Amino acid sequence: MRVVFQQCTKFSTSCNRAFLARFLKPVMNASPKEHVVKQLLKPVGLNVPPRPNIKYSEGNSWLDLFDGAKTEERIKELEIEFAKSGMYEMATFRKTNGKLFLSPESYWKADKALYFPHLSGRTLSSEDHGNVEDVLRGKTSVIRVFSTQVGDKISREYIKNTELGIDNYENQSCQVIDINFLENKLKSWLFKLSLNNLKSTVPVQRHDNYWLCHREQIPFLMRERLLINNVYSGYIFVVDPNLKIRFMACGPASADEFNKLWKVVGQLSKEKK
């Protein structure tokens, strides 16, 4: 009986070690690759349109742990996540100055374009919780997404061009939406304390379209797919009335990108007609 017990114990221990080793593998393999700046060719976005109360899943359920294929897939996902740590993001931002990719030559056609994700949050004008897609539907929207002051600053270059004296917050062809991503609970708490200060720095007429949303709503790999994972940069989406992403940019705006973005907005306005 003792022999059987010892054998069972050894088997259990070896199984636990093997199980643990599989999930430690991502940590061991987490060697980040150098970021390469490329021009966007394929549409960016999700295959399904956003809808209220949708919750994007991350990782595996408990039952999935016993599914070899799903577990292996999750291990590969974790390798990517561990490799792209905060230090990696900072180093990449410094190297690229936030220009993580180059915007496409032209806008993506409606039949090829993918969807903007579901996001919920509050605006500066109201404490009520709402869904961002509700204000996007039926309108052409230019959306700024940022999490930091530097991201806010550089993404604003696509809206306001001081050299040309252009302020497209007043553009009649579209609406401009600001999405301030709150990274974590600490930042969310700090924002609550400094909300009045934030309101004073944002013009009152923009409060309705200035959103505060928790970044965690969109899981890591989905942020990778949407190309918005680097917390230090700022991002621009042009979204059509059907909630599809038709154009995207990031980092500082060159004169060419500024003009290209607003040319896209003009073309989408003609589509509506």
UniProtKB/Swiss-Prot annotation:
The keyword Translocase is assigned to this record: no
Keywords from the named record: Membrane, Mitochondrion, Mitochondrion inner membrane
Disulfide bonds, paired cysteine numbers: none
Transmembrane regions listed in the UniProt entry: none
Location(s), subcellular: Mitochondrion inner membrane
GO CC annotations, alphabetized: mitochondrial inner membrane
Keyword Plastid: no
Signal peptide (UniProt feature, chain positions): none
Pfam families recorded: ATP-synt_10
Lineage top rank: taxon: Eukaryota
InterPro entries according to UniProt: ATP10
GO MF, one annotated term: unfolded protein binding
Annotated function: Involved in assembly of the mitochondrial F1-F0 complex.
Family: Belongs to the ATP10 family.
PANTHER family per UniProt: MITOCHONDRIAL ATPASE COMPLEX SUBUNIT ATP10
Protein name: Mitochondrial ATPase complex subunit ATP10
